[in-house]
Structure formats: C-alpha cells, structure tokens
C-alpha cells in the first residue's frame, strides 16, 4: 500500500489527540498537518494542547513541534499538503457542515468524526465491518459537489458501536424490536475526571441528542443505496435511554431484542463467533482479528478489563439470556474513543484507501 499524507483537523481536542496517537506509527498514513481554532494557529502542537493532553501515552515526539494551522482560514493551504484529512472539530453543527464541504470542494477528502453530515443523504456513515458497500455513494456525492477527488465520509456515533455490531449478524432472523440502554463514559464528552470532577460518584440520566442518534443512525447504517442517496431501513423499531456514568473510557449497552424468527441461543452465539467483515478479509492495519468476542462469565464484559481488547477495536458481548418481554437480552461494550471515534475513523480511512478513493 502506498503512503498517504494526512491532516488532523481539530487536533487539540480529545478525539484529535487520539487520532495523533493512533497515526504516530501508522503503516499507510503520515501526519503532515495539524490544525485547530485560530487561537491555536501559529503555536506548536505542544503549546496549543498545553496541560490538556488527555492520553495515557505521551504526545508523539514527531508532532510536538509541528506548527498548528487554522482549520478554517488555511483550507486551501492544508488541501495542497495532504491526500485527505481526519476531522474532529468542536464547532456548531452548521459550521462543521460548511467546513467539511469546503475541504471536499478544495479536492481534499474528509473522514469525519463529527455528527454534522451523518444524515446528509449522499454521505456514507460507515461501520467498516457492517456497511462497507455504502462508500460507493461517494461517486454520486462527488457529482453533487462538482469534485474529482473531494468527498465526505463519516463514522457513526460512538453509542451505537457497542450494540449495532452485535445485532448485525442476527439480522437474518428479522430484527423486530430493540431496546438499548447505554452507559456512556465521560471521554465521550471530551472530558476526564480531572476536568469534570462532578462526575465522580455520579450518574447523569441525560446526554443531549444521544437518544435520537442512537435510534436513528442504525437505520441509515442498515440502509440501501437508491437514486444516488442512502435510504434508511424501516426496521427494526429501536428505543434507547442514554446515561453518562463515572467511567473514563468504554460505552456499555444493555440490549433487549425480539425477532420475526426467533433463533436459538446456540445460533446467536455461532453468528457472533463466525462473523467477519471486509476489514478482516482485507487485513486492514487497524482491524481486529476477531470483531465480536463473547464472554461466558456472568460478570463480563467490564469496561476496565475489556475495553482495550484488540487495541480497543473489538466489541465485547456477554450475558446472553432469554427474556420474558423480548426474545433475548445481552450486554455489550466498545471503547468509545477507539472503535467509537478515532480508531473507527482510521479504520474507515484504511477501507477507503484500500478501495482507491484517495488516489
């Protein structure tokens, strides 16, 4: 695979920092540009982040002294230096939409961690193991944007990446009704216990916009391409409750599901065990070898023990049981800033690179 020069837009935030650490020794991608808000522009990356470095590993040495660029004012300059950008900015939704489109129109593809373009009909929202074929919509999107190379591809919300992968191989039994209660880590809000002390010994029963995303995004991920847009699937019916819990990393979901054709417990376990996607077939650098891991123990998965499974890119599942109201219930866990954010973004970029979309 050839090498690609990349930029991180929004490099100073938590997801931007995670992108920086993941790309430090990436076999295909070299970080050439770091950009953020005007107040960071002109400073070194180290100066711009200051005491806000939230990763457990040190800031990549090769990036410390890189001079920050202005994500909005320097679009043309950035586009000239890189093959594509990762976008993880903290701005208003309509501003993000405008920004990402400006990069795409400057012939600089955008792999976005933001929610702004997730429901743009010709923007693929991809979990690489689940709907890799949605990247084919890029041809139609380029037509609309009037670009040769430029496009926007997004990853889905971190909350759905715990339970949608577990449900996906079971779709052949006809998913009917899904209830998911998510217990979401504070890093999902870009925070640590140091910056959000109110979360110690606390639980907040509301995360703005999260329930809507958690109920609607899976329907697009499972949708189909028709007439140059992605049309959402009508089923299953999904209802969610999303809670912020005092955990640093790792989103857990308690899932209840009913089927058109109820499978046996053994059939479900077999589906999870044997499921493999395009990233595994292509052996993409960030892909977990085994995407779905099932734990037999009653007290697993646990955020502390299992979130880093396969470099934080695998999904952990446990406690599969029959249910009196639904057919089955189970618990699943994913690392929200790895699989759920930057790691999922890097994996999506690897898929796009392998399929020639950056050439």
How would you name each of these model-derived features?
Residues 1-205, 237, 309, 315-316, ...:
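N-terminal Rossmann-like NAD(P) cofactor-binding subdomain of oxidoreductases
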Residues 187-359:
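Charged docking surfaces used in two-component/phosphorelay signaling
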């Amino acid at each position: 695979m050839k090498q690609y020069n990349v930029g991180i837009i929004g490099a100073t935030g938590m997801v931007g920092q995670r992108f920086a650490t993941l790309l430090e020794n990436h076999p295909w991608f070299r970080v050439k540009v770091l950009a953020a808000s005007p107040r960071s522009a002109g400073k070194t990356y180290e100066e711009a982040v200051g005491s806000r470095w939230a990763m457990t590993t040190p800031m990549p040495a090769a990036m410390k002294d890189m001079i920050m660029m202005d994500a909005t004012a320097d679009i043309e300059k950035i586009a000239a230096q890189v093959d594509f950008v990762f976008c993880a900015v903290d701005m208003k939704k309509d501003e993000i939409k405008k920004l990402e489109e400006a990069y795409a129109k400057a012939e600089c593809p955008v792999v976005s961690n933001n929610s702004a373009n997730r429901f743009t009909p010709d923007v693929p929202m991809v979990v690489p193991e689940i709907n890799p074929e949605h990247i084919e919509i890029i041809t139609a999107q380029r037509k609309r944007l009037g670009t040769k190379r430029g496009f926007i591809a997004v990853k889905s919300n971190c909350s759905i990446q715990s339970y949608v992968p577990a449900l996906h191989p079971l779709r052949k039994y006809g998913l009917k009704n899904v209830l998911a209660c998510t217990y979401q880590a504070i890093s999902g809000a870009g925070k640590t216990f140091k910056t959000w002390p109110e979360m110690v010994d606390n639980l907040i029963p509301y995360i703005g916009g999260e329930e809507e995303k958690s109920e609607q995004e899976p329907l697009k991920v499972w949708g189909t391409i028709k007439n140059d847009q992605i049309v959402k699937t009508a089923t299953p019916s999904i209802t969610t409750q999303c809670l912020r819990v005092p955990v640093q990393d790792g989103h857990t979901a308690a899932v209840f599901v009913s089927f058109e054709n109820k499978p046996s417990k053994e059939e479900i376990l077999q589906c999870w065990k044997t499921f493999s996607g395009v990233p595994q077939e292509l052996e993409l650098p960030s892909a977990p070898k085994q995407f779905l891991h099932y734990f037999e123990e009653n007290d697993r998965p646990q955020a502390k023990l299992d979130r880093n499974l396969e470099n934080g890119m695998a999904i952990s599942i446990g406690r599969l049981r029959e249910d009196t109201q639904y057919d089955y219930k189970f618990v699943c866990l994913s690392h929200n800033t790895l699989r759920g954010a930057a790691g999922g973004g890097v994996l999506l970029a690897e898929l796009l690179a392998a399929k020639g979309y950056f050439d």
